[in-house]
Amino acid sequence: SMDFLNEDKGLFSYKWGLYSAGHAVLDPVKSDISEAHVQKRDRSKVTLVGDSGGFQVAKGVLKFPWDKFKEPGGKCDEVRIKILKWLEHTADWSMILDVPSFSIHFDTGLKTFKECLEYTCHNNDFFMEWRTPGATKFLNVLQGNDLRTADQWYDAVKGYSDPKIHGEKAFEGWAMGGENMRWWYLILYRMIKMRDDGLLENKDWLHFLGTSHLQAAIQLTAIKRNL
């Protein structure tokens, strides 16, 4: 069997996996059938991270009508709630639905960093309002194309991770995107800022998007051991 999330049946197995809403069956009932190897996994043995589809937004695969992005009860809200409930049904840890700052470099209809940040905060507000605490743990995604914009992004979204502000609905971990995932000066700088803000306390997952090479594994392990 190629069911690599099942150590008893798979030809090989992994204890961790990542699955994106951008490629999934978002109807939980249908997903339970067609993606049973994911949904029926032994959750005591396998940890699954759910990607919200932000990368697909950046590449123009997951399209939003930006002029109606904030319309209450509109089609964008329908997409948001489908992704939110799929993540809660599927994943142990989940990305919020960010609009990556590098989206402006592709054919997405987005032109400015400000738009990406504004729309991400709108999605964060939606997830914060409609999430079921405990169904999945959310990772607050950090983006930014340079130090200045990375600081702007962090300052705008850090409150979503603060239990003093949002109580049990505060996001439980962090995900590093944009320059935060590859520029080591910025990574260390951000870790210090997060530490000083008390926003690494009781955060059990720090995810680096798009990072899989061996050198990064060594460097990130060193950081982890010193946090």
Predicted regions and their residues:
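Non-catalytic, usually N-terminal nucleic-acid engagement modules in DNA/RNA processing proteins
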Residues: 1-130
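Glycine-rich phosphate/ribose-binding loops and adjacent secondary-structure elements
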Residues: 133-227
